[in-house]
Amino acid sequence: MNKRIGTYPDDEGRLLSGLKLLVVEDEALIAMEVEEMIAALGAEIVGSFSRVTDALEAVEREAVVGAILDIQLDGATTLTLVDVLLGRNCPILFVTGGAPESIPENYRQLPRLSKPFNQVDFVRSAKLIFGRR
């Protein structure tokens, strides 16, 4: 991986090619970083949302195959969206600043990346979760 964010060797740059991923994050800087890293891996970003209702509408319109989600969005949770995505067999990566025990027990088995995270950890997680699709 090159040092500059968003650039990868050719083999990693196509790793997620053709996948439509959803980003749900209410912190604008983190959302932009996630979008940049996902795009650099070759995925198409269906949308980046800070509200669950907007993300749910996108899931109804688009053929989303996976999602990177914060659990808490300005006082609301993304768990309704998580349930919809899981019902469609979409893999999910939680990106959260909360402690593991703050996640409801029936969602704790889902992959989680703690904020703050670095590019290497994010790419590794994305490969494991979305690379096998």
Where are these regions (language model features)?
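Acidic catalytic/metal-coordinating carboxylates
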Residues: 77-80
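Active-site residues of response regulator receiver
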Residues: 70
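Acidic, metal-coordinating helix/loop segments flanking the phosphotransfer/catalytic sites
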Residues: 48-66
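Non-catalytic signal-transmission and effector/linker regions of two-component phosphorelay proteins
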Residues: 1-20, 104, 118-133
